[in-house]
């Protein structure tokens, strides 16, 4: 088995070099992959302050998803500095000792693989 000869490898390297040089010369970008226009025309300090304010004004995707799961806010959640139920694994709505957090209420079927 012979190794690769140097002539085809040199030709491939030359073609790739010419291709990349041609692409670099004809590109419209100034080094960025995606041209982005600046929205702020002030100083760096002014622009960074406006960006920080916008960051806290926008609601995060996670907050929107969490709030979208329920259509109401309970009175307990509106009280200040309180934990709804401090018992580990207990339901917020049923904080009694021994109460199940998520009681199983579906019937038994082959799909759920429950014991009979």
From Swiss-Prot:
Disulfide bonds join 85-95, 108-114. Belongs to the plant rapid alkalinization factor (RALF) family. GO terms for molecular function: hormone activity. PANTHER family: PROTEIN RALF-LIKE 33-RELATED, RAPID ALKALINIZATION FACTOR-LIKE. The keyword Disulfide bond applies. Expressed in roots, stems, leaves and plants. It is found in: Secreted. The record marks 64-65 as: Required for proteolytic cleavage. GO terms for biological process: calcium-mediated signaling; cell-cell signaling; regulation of growth. Glycans are attached at residue 41. This is Protein RALF-like 33. Keywords: Disulfide bond, Glycoprotein, Hormone, Secreted, Signal. Proteolytically cleaved, probably by S1P, a subtilisin-like serine protease (subtilase). It comes from Arabidopsis thaliana. The gene is RALFL33. It comes from the Eukaryota. Cell signaling peptide that may regulate plant stress, growth, and development. Mediates a rapid alkalinization of extracellular space by mediating a transient increase in the cytoplasmic Ca(2+) concentration leading to a calcium-dependent signaling events through a cell surface receptor and a concomitant activation of some intracellular mitogen-activated protein kinases. Residues 24-67 form a propeptide.
């Amino acid at each position: 088995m012979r190794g690769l000869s140097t002539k085809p490898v040199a030709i491939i390297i030359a073609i790739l070099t010419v291709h990349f040089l041609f692409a670099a010369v004809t590109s419209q970008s100034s080094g960025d992959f995606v041209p982005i226009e600046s929205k702020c025309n002030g100083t760096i300090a002014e622009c960074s302050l406006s960006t920080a304010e916008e960051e806290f004004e926008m609601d995060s995707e996670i907050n929107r998803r969490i709030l979208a799961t329920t259509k109401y806010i309970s009175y307990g959640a509106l009280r200040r500095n309180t934990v709804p139920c401090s018992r580990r694994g207990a339901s917020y709505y049923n904080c009694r000792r021994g109460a199940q957090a998520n009681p199983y209420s579906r019937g038994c079927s082959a799909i759920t693989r429950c014991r009979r």
